[in-house]
Regions:
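Short low-complexity stretches enriched in small and charged residues
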Residues: 1-4, 30-32, 54, 107
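STAS-typified acidic loop motif
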Residues: 3-31, 48
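Amphipathic alpha-helical interaction surfaces in cytosolic regulatory modules
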Residues: 23-97
């Protein structure tokens, strides 16, 4: 089960993913986040509460990243936990995302463009 929490910080939409981002909820994730992309080009995914991800979940994150990039925006990740990090490492998906150790570091990386 997955829950999403949305917080606007300046021009950045912080999305906290709580639980498991897996096949059973990946389509819902894509639809929900895509809906928010209409008004928010800069996304920050706080993954501190995400305890599991599978290939469908990775695909959903990549999909959102591509949509954000197509709108001259960006999607960044923060607080990736050890178990999901293994999936990122094995698949080498970490190469296409900016991943930060903290939400504050990720927010700072958006710079003045997102303020």
């Amino acid at each position: 089960m997955m829950e999403l929490k949305f917080d606007k910080i300046g021009n950045v939409l912080k999305i906290t993913v709580d639980g498991r981002l897996v096949a059973a909820c990946s389509e819902e994730f894509k639809e929900t986040v895509s809906g928010w992309l209409a008004d928010n080009r800069f996304l920050l995914f706080d993954l501190s509460q995400m305890n599991h991800i599978d290939s469908s979940g990775l695909g959903a994150l990549v999909y959102v990243l591509q949509k954000a990039n197509a709108q001259d925006g960006s999607a960044k990740l923060a607080c990736l936990q050890p178990r999901p990090r293994i999936v990122f490492d094995i698949t080498k998906v970490y190469r296409i995302f900016e991943i930060f150790d903290s939400v504050d570091a990720a927010l700072a990386s958006f710079g003045t463009e997102a303020k």
